[in-house]
A protein has these predicted regions:
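C-terminal substrate-recognition regions of SAM-dependent nucleic acid methyltransferases
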Residues: 1-151, 158-166
C-alpha cells in the first residue's frame, strides 16, 4: 500500500519491448503527423458561392467546399490556366486526364491553411500498385501560395525551400 506507481500510459506486455518503447518514446517531440496534411485539408470559402451562386447546385452541400479530384471540371469558371493580372491568386495542383497540372484560383476563395504560406512537399494520395520495389512518383515541392486538390497530400510547413527539398 505504500508504493507509488507511475501511470502505465501505453501497456506493453513484454518487458523488453516495454523498455525499448519507453526509451524511444521519451525522445519523440515532433512527429510526422504534426506536419502532414491529408487530401481533404484544403477547403473553399463561402464567398466563392456568394460571388458565383450558380456553383451551388454542382454537388451536394457536404462536398461543396472540398477541393475534390474533379475540382477543375466542376468549377472551371473560377480556375484559370494562366494567372490573371488582377487580384491575388493561389496555385492549385490537381490532376486531369492529361496528368498533373495546376490552375489559379482567387486567394479569397481558398480557406487559409496551415501550410499555404509555407514550403511543403506534395505527394500523390494514391501511388502505383503497391508492388515491392516499385518506383514512386516524383514528389513536387510546393512553394508558398500553393494548395492542392484531394489528389495529393502535403507534408511540411517549412520556412525555407531547402527544408522541403530535404524532407
Amino acid at each position: 500500500w505504500d508504493k507509488v506507481f507511475e501511470p502505465i500510459e501505453t501497456f506493453i506486455a513484454i518487458p523488453e519491448l516495454d523498455s525499448i518503447y519507453k526509451k524511444v518514446h521519451r525522445y519523440q517531440e515532433n512527429t510526422l503527423d504534426s506536419i502532414m496534411y491529408g487530401s481533404d485539408s484544403h477547403k473553399l470559402e463561402d464567398i466563392l458561392f456568394e460571388d458565383y451562386p450558380d456553383l451551388l447546385n454542382r454537388t451536394d452541400a457536404t462536398h461543396r467546399k472540398a477541393l475534390s479530384t474533379n475540382l477543375f471540371e466542376r468549377y472551371p469558371e473560377v480556375l484559370f490556366s494562366e494567372k490573371p493580372d488582377n487580384d491575388e491568386y493561389v496555385k492549385i495542383w490537381g490532376r486531369s486526364k492529361a496528368g498533373r497540372l495546376f490552375k489559379y484560383l482567387k486567394a479569397k476563395y481558398l480557406r487559409v491553411h496551415p501550410n499555404l504560406f509555407k514550403y511543403k512537399v506534395l505527394l500523390p494520395k494514391a501511388n502505383g500498385s503497391g508492388a515491392i520495389g516499385e518506383v514512386l512518383s516524383t514528389p513536387l515541392i510546393g512553394e508558398p501560395l500553393i494548395g492542392h486538390t484531394q489528389t495529393f497530400i502535403s507534408i511540411g510547413n517549412f520556412n525555407e525551400k531547402k527544408e522541403a527539398e530535404n524532407c
